[in-house]
Amino acid sequence: MKRVREENETLHLENARRSPPLASTHFLGFPCISLFYSQHKSTKKNIYLDLKTKKKELLPMVFALRAFKIFLKLFYQHILLNLSTLITTFSLFLLYIVVTPLMIGFSKDFLCHFHLGLIWICLLFSFLPERFFQNDFEDGTLELYYLSGYCLQKILLSKLYGHWVLQISGVFCSFPVLQLLYQFDQSKMNWFTIIIGSQIFTLMCGIHSCLALGITSNGWNSLQNLTTLPTLLPLIVFCTSIETEWFHVILLMGYLLLFLFFYPILVSITLQTLLAK
């Protein structure tokens, strides 16, 4: 009996050595532990694959948020560095709208009928003299933007819109004085057209500035007149007639979308050839 017991113990030890504990059907009184281990391993693998696919799906969103964060940083930095633009735009626009009635008279009939044309001409004169990106080009900031690997068009667009916010804030601050002189109703349509039209003016200035970056200051005025006149006339017609016809609102929005479409193309062509030199 003792010999039989020893033989059974040795056989049991040999079987335990040959097969791993998790692969046995009965181990420490728990049956089918290998099935539980395989199920746990498969669920862990599925969770890993799900996380991997979700990470791939979220990558474009992460890059978009990072680009938007850079856009806001440049936008905010441009506003902080150019707060003097708010004062200059406010003073220029206020000077134009005060001097014009002094020259043509304070007739209520004339000012009520032609106030939109006068406002848009004053707005144009306060927006157009700017030379965007000239200081950035001279001190090498544009080259750093170009070599950074980020989208140069978006960087310049953020700087343009930062400048637009400062300018349009100066214009809106002078509206109470404008109301006293011209005596017109401040309708929502006037605010809407000024916001859209001023964006078009800013995009026009940005395109002209990019085209004239390599030109000296002597040839800037002639180039500005040649490039702005063809794009200026339809915009002035739309903005002055927008009080009577709603169809011109759609044309004005289409004009804005047209400039938003052509802006990155023209900027990329001009700046890449200029900075490559």
Curated annotation (Swiss-Prot):
Keyword hit for Mitochondrion: yes
A GO-annotated cellular component: mitochondrial membrane
Gene Ontology MF terms in the entry: heme transmembrane transporter activity
Cellular localisation: Mitochondrion membrane
Membrane-crossing residue ranges in chain numbering: 61-81, 110-130, 164-184, 194-214, 227-247, 249-269
Record-stated family: Belongs to the CcmB/CycW/HelB family.
Primary site of residence: mitochondrion
Organism: Marchantia polymorpha (Common liverwort)
Pfam annotation, one family: CcmB
Keyword line: Cytochrome c-type biogenesis, Membrane, Mitochondrion, Transmembrane, Transmembrane helix, Transport
Topology of the protein relative to the lipid bilayer: Multi-pass membrane protein
Protein name, entry field: Putative cytochrome c biogenesis ccmB-like mitochondrial protein
Role summary: May be involved in the export of heme to the mitochondrion for the biogenesis of c-type cytochromes.
Keyword Transport: yes
GO terms of biological process kind: cytochrome complex assembly
